[in-house]
Amino acid sequence: MTEGKSIINANLTPLPDKVGVDGLEDKWRTVWDEDGTYKFRNTRDRKAVYSIDTPPPTVSGSLHVGHVFSYTHTDVIARYKRMRGYDVFYPMGWDDNGLPTERRVQNYYGVRVDVSLPYDPDFKPPFEGTDGKKIDAKDQVPISRKNFIELCERLTAQDEKLFEALWRKLGLSIDWSQTYHTIGQHPQRVAQKAFLRNLARGEAYQQDAPGLWDVTFQTAVAQAELESREYPGFYHKVAFRFEDGTPIYIETTRPELLAACTSLIANPNDERYKQYFGQYVYSPLFKVKVPILAHPAAEMDKGAGIAMCCTFGDVTDVEWWRDLKLPTRPIIQRNGRIVMDTPDWIEDPAGREVFAETAGKTTFSARKIIVDKLRESGDLDGEPTPTKRMTNFYEKGDKPLEIVTSRQWYLKNGGTDAKLNAELIERGKELEFHPDFMRVRYENWVHGLNGDWLISRQRFFGVPFPLWYPVNASGEPDYDHPITPSEDRLPIDPTIDVPEGYDESQRDVPGGFTAEKDIMDTWATSSLTPQIVTHWAEPDEASKALFASTFPMDLRPQGQDIIRTWLFSTVDRAHLENKCLPWAHATLSGWILDPDHKKMSKSKGNVVVPNEPIEKFGADAVRYWAAAARLGLDATYDIGQMKIGRRLAIKLLNATKFALAIGREDENHHVGAAAEAAWNPADVTEPLDRAAMAKLALVVRQATEALESYEHSKALEVIESYFWQFCDDYIELVKNRAYGTPDEHGNVPSEKAVKSARTALGLGLDAFARLLAPYLPYATEEVWSWMHAGSGSVHRAAWPVVDPYVEAATGASPELLTWAGKAVEQLRKIKSEAKVSMKTPILSVALSAASEGVEAIHAALGDIAQAGRVVGKFDLVAKHAEESAAEGTPETEVAVEASELGEPPAKKPKH
């Protein structure tokens, strides 16, 4: 296709006998791969590149239609930008490390890690595949850490092939030569390099501190990974006693923590307890002496208004412990059970006996024992009363989190540094959020941070911290003086690799070294996706050129639910490392809801596998459903929308074939023979054709503005609305003239009028192929191949500009087409109400409309009469606004004043 001085030259191929959407995916996907249609060239400067930080989907089994939904939004923008002339950098990654992957591997192969076991090079898992069923830990075969990691790598490789096949079928215009795995060597090198630089600048640090702990997954959990869920429990009214035996009552939902109590806390303004501040009481059962203290965070209207502070029952306990410098009395282990040894602070013999009964028990079992003992001692006032409380859960867990003291790695994120917090708020203000109301979620999250980002995890399949520690003469690790590798050694696994100056024989012995065994949280790697895909800080020239042309990136598309995790953490990392935003724009997709308007998720079991609708309706139809939804808003899984999308794709094929076939008969009267065409806007001379071009110019302008603002659904709505009007009204109105068909009186349209119609049809359908290309890549590529053989893909063609359509319109109003369409609609209505064939002639008719409507209809009267088979008198009556108001007729409507039908055509005899 060439477009010089607004003339569009077309090379028309022979048209297929039958058209349809089935089979288009396989046909065009092969061509795109062979031609490198979506390959990133990287031959131009930064301004000519559009780079996308594509979300790497979590490799933990299967995708659902929610993924198809959000990734389609991104692909629409990628395709649009490519057609706008940008060299689009659109990579794909796989988030294949972390807890979701580990859990899938455990269930899929029926295994679990036992770090004490040696590596078995001949290990074969007991089975493969469990149809998503959870395998109990007691039934899982213990294997070494290395064997487990090998199984993780094997299964994720299988899953990634399936994911890629789905994305390709959906038509994502990914450059598949630009892929990465978050557990791969390059991402590991980036993650470790960034961490070492954070460490050198004092932004990463380790600390022994109380933190949230998931007893199921046996790992620490960050604030961003929390979910607050309603959890049933019981309030227990329990007596602490003064020296003289006088009781003071607290109410608690966790009596099993009585042995961990350090104090009683009340609000300093609570008149009920002011007299007791500074005094001491004894805990029930254990007889441990604890002070009564004041703290403003104590809630006067909650329970008894006075609470016990234990180490640790919840985050409030941590706050009180820290502010009031209370002792640490931990009794819960990392496995969620009570410690085996009776603590030294319990000195009372009877108290030590009670504790011994709870040792090694789960918190649930210990609670039952303690409540029974409180009844026996008389320290339980009444029976427990049921309650529901909001409790912290790990977002992927099913048990309430405990708070356990452990050594962990943290990264500064503004949670403890007011200056950094303010800087990250400012970064959020620099970022263009789409939709903009999502910005407040970012700001609320940053303002509400109460601690730095915990980035270490006590798991196995992840990026290792590139650290060792010296081991002193007593065999204890010196955590205050970590040993770091040089960057040119990265990536390293400290459990396998040896620090410089040491050898393997010195591992885990006095005077030697020991490895950091924790791994990085998966978000600690995912937060660096902009640096990973753009090859930040890599020494080779190709990587330097890639980084220069793609970073900072242009777009981060993602779900609204991970603003606090992925979006914020990526902003934090880029701010610390690159002193800038990682991208200029962020688009936030909503959730997909099931028919009951509940969020689709694998954990709820209400997901739809995307292969099903793609196979049934076609990729274009599924993309249409996804693209019709606005950013930031939830949408339902709607088969009806997919059917509309399929109908739209089929209509594009049929309408284009119909219009391109006009006037293309070879000597054997075969319709649609190969031909060349030049669609010159100057050849559009008829009023109706010019009106169609005027409307097209308006649509191109509105769609372009919407897509520039990342409003893909608004652009689709504008394009689709006019496409149907173009097909249902314009093509129907001009097809007789385009064919050169004589009217009912034998008058043949002029050559000029015929050319005007054919040119407008060509210009229009060429434009629609390009306008719909980001949404319906397969159907548009098919029709483009009929129009522009040999010119390459529609997805490398230029996005339409208004110039040729403005030139063709020469000042015409698009309203002329609207009025003409309404007039034809009334002519059809006359026949449908009379229950006669649409081919029935109208002997005479009078239509009324507002004066501007009459003027517009008159300008296209010949086309309207021929489309409606008006063979006789055709009168137009102008109505003033007052008349329309009196009759209750809208000023924008056309009405039938009088009509007379002729004889319906004779029915053809059946053979």
UniProtKB/Swiss-Prot annotation:
Motif 'KMSKS' region location, chain numbering: 599-603
Family: Belongs to the class-I aminoacyl-tRNA synthetase family. ValS type 2 subfamily.
Role noted for this protein: Catalyzes the attachment of valine to tRNA(Val). As ValRS can inadvertently accommodate and process structurally similar amino acids such as threonine, to avoid such errors, it has a 'posttransfer' editing activity that hydrolyzes mischarged Thr-tRNA(Val) in a tRNA-dependent manner.
A single GO molecular function term of this UniProt record: valine-tRNA ligase activity
Protein's UniProt keywords contain Cell cycle: no
Pfam families per the UniProt record, alphabetical: Anticodon_1, tRNA-synt_1
Superkingdom of this protein's organism: Bacteria
Record's protein name: Valine--tRNA ligase
Organism: Bifidobacterium longum (strain NCC 2705)
Binding site for ATP: K602
Short sequence motif 'HIGH' region: positions: 57-67
Top-level class of the enzyme under EC nomenclature: ligase
Domain comment (free text): ValRS has two distinct active sites: one for aminoacylation and one for editing. The misactivated threonine is translocated from the active site to the editing site.
Keyword Cytoplasm recorded: yes
Principal cellular location given in the protein's record: cytoplasm
PROSITE patterns: AA_TRNA_LIGASE_I
An annotated GO cellular component: cytosol
Subunit structure: Monomer.
EC number: 6.1.1.9
GO biological process terms on file: valyl-tRNA aminoacylation
Catalysed reaction equations from the record: tRNA(Val) + L-valine + ATP = L-valyl-tRNA(Val) + AMP + diphosphate
UniProt xrefs under CDD domains: Anticodon_Ia_Val (cd07962)
Keywords annotated in UniProt: Aminoacyl-tRNA synthetase, ATP-binding, Cytoplasm, Ligase, Nucleotide-binding, Protein biosynthesis
